[in-house]
Each structure stands twice: as structure tokens, then as C-alpha cells.
Amino acid sequence: MRIFLSAIYWNHSKFLWNSENWPIKVPWYGLCFSLGILFASLLGIYLAKSSYNSEDEKNFSKEQLSGALENFALYSLLFIIPGSRIAYILFYGGDFYFKHPREILKVWNGGLASHGGMLGLILWALIFSWRYRKKISVLTFLFLCDLCASVFGCAAFMIRIGNFMNQEIVGKPTSLPWGIIFSSPAQGVLGVPVHPVQLYEGMSYLLLSIILFFLSYKRYFRLGSGWVTSLGLVGISLIRFFAEFFKSHQGKVIGPNSPLTMGQILSFPLFVFGLCLGIACFLKNKKKRSPTSSVK
């Protein structure tokens, strides 16, 4: 890495380990992705255990809760990765994967979409809560979604760091002093300083997640189920929407002159769903607080 007067030249290797004597390569993106999921899982389990109370002790132990959430985190990858891949193929791949179907399974060549990963995680939370709720009553669908919303920023931040190391999802040209000149960018123009939009987006997700984590920590039942998910979806969609303005070409929906990117279009349903969920939670809490008249 070399720092110029007006930009930072980034020529760091995309691999943590890449030896000619060994066939195994360790890319930074894969490491960041794995560590992000691991850290988010550990934080989620810790957060769930912080809400464990005397009422829960009557039905299940803290160890049972921890074990169930470990299974949830482990098997979530079977939904996150395929969901991310399918969404990328449908919304960003164009005709390439239809002409080259063998490339669909080559995830190691890149091509994951975060919106698809979120949908995969939501589907897994729905299935998991259906299977486990009778054993551990606290593991409702909204409880799991609130947990994921509270810790997602850790994974999202690490994944965007991986994108940065991989020199992909490159920003638009900038004259700002922290502009980055990537040595081999996946998009954009070579040798031009660009916004480090991966860092903008990743740090924004992390900040949002920190706020949601502290809103949830030992206060889950007071806040009410669904609120954290609602705030998370609204926040994620807004961050993604505005981050797209700093990115180079990434899947224009109609043509090169389209005002919106595919990422912005896909963020709109998340925003609407999060807003509707927030309204539903507000009305539900308002109904609980309203005084009931008794007949005498």
C-alpha cells in the first residue's frame, strides 16, 4: 500500500495464503466471510442468553437454548449461501449463467447477493422456529429475526472488508484525500481514485447493529418482539440505497441511463416490509397498553 498526496494506492494481495508449493489458496474474502458469520453467531448466542430469565428456567435450560442456537447458526449457511447465489444469478448474472450453467455452482469464482442471503436466513428462521418452538418456547420466528438483526452488522462489516480486499464493489471516482486507487479493480477504471464504498457501507451496517444490539441486550421483552427486526430492515435498506450512489456500475435495471440500480430496487421491498412490521408492532403494543373497562 502506497499513500500519495491525494489518494491511497492499494495493491494488497487478494489472498492471505497463496503458495506455489501448495495447491490450497486462502482468499481474504473467504476468511472475512467465515469470521463474520462466526462472530455474529457468538454474539447472537450471548445476546439470547442475556434475556434468559426465571420463567424460562421452568421450561428449558440455558444450555439447551445455547445448543439450539448453535444449530441455528451452523445450518443457516445452507440457506444463506444458496440464497445469495440464486439472487445474484437472477438479478445480476444476466444471460451469462443461462449460457454457461456449469458456472452456477462455482461459488468460489464470486457472485453472491446480500438480499438473497437475507431471504434465505428469514426462510431458515421460519423453518427453525416451527421445529423448535415446542421444545424451547422462546425460539419464535420474531425472536430469531430480532437476534439476527441485532448482530448482522458484524457479519456484514467483515464481508465488506472482504470485498475491499478483493477489490470488488468498487466506488465511483473521487478527488477526496481518502480515495483509493486499486491495483486490479473488478469494476471501474484502472488508476483512478475511487470512493472506498465498501468501508462506507460496512461501517454503517456495523454502527446500526451496535445500536440494535444495545437496544436488545437484557431489554428484549421490554422493547417487544419485532421492533429490532423492523428497525434493522429499515436501516439496512436505507444504508444500501444510499451506498449505491457511490458505487460504480452494478446491475442497472433498465439500461445505462437508469436512475436506480438493482440493489436499490431490491432494497425497496425490505424497507416497506420493515415499515409495515414497525407499524404492526406499534399497534400491538398500543393495544396492550390501552385500559380495558370492566363491567360491574
Curated annotation (Swiss-Prot):
Known pathway: Protein modification; lipoprotein biosynthesis (diacylglyceryl transfer)
Major location category of this protein: membrane
Domain of life: Bacteria
Statement: the UniProt record of this protein carries the keyword Cell inner membrane: yes
GO molecular function: phosphatidylglycerol-prolipoprotein diacylglyceryl transferase activity
EC number: 2.5.1.145
Enzyme class: transferase
Binding sites annotated in the UniProt record for a 1,2-diacyl-sn-glycero-3-phospho-(1'-sn-glycerol): 160
Membrane topology: Multi-pass membrane protein
UniProtKB keywords: Cell inner membrane, Cell membrane, Membrane, Transferase, Transmembrane, Transmembrane helix
GO cellular component, one term: plasma membrane
InterPro entries for this protein: Lgt
Biological process, per Gene Ontology: lipoprotein biosynthetic process
Residue pairs linked by disulfide bridges in the UniProt entry: none
Entry's transmembrane regions: 28-48, 72-92, 110-130, 139-159, 197-217, 226-246, 263-283
Subcellular location: Cell inner membrane
Family the entry assigns: Belongs to the Lgt family.
Function: Catalyzes the transfer of the diacylglyceryl group from phosphatidylglycerol to the sulfhydryl group of the N-terminal cysteine of a prolipoprotein, the first step in the formation of mature lipoproteins.
Name of the protein described by the UniProt record: Phosphatidylglycerol--prolipoprotein diacylglyceryl transferase
Lineage of the species this protein comes from: Bacteria, Pseudomonadati, Chlamydiota, Chlamydiia, Chlamydiales
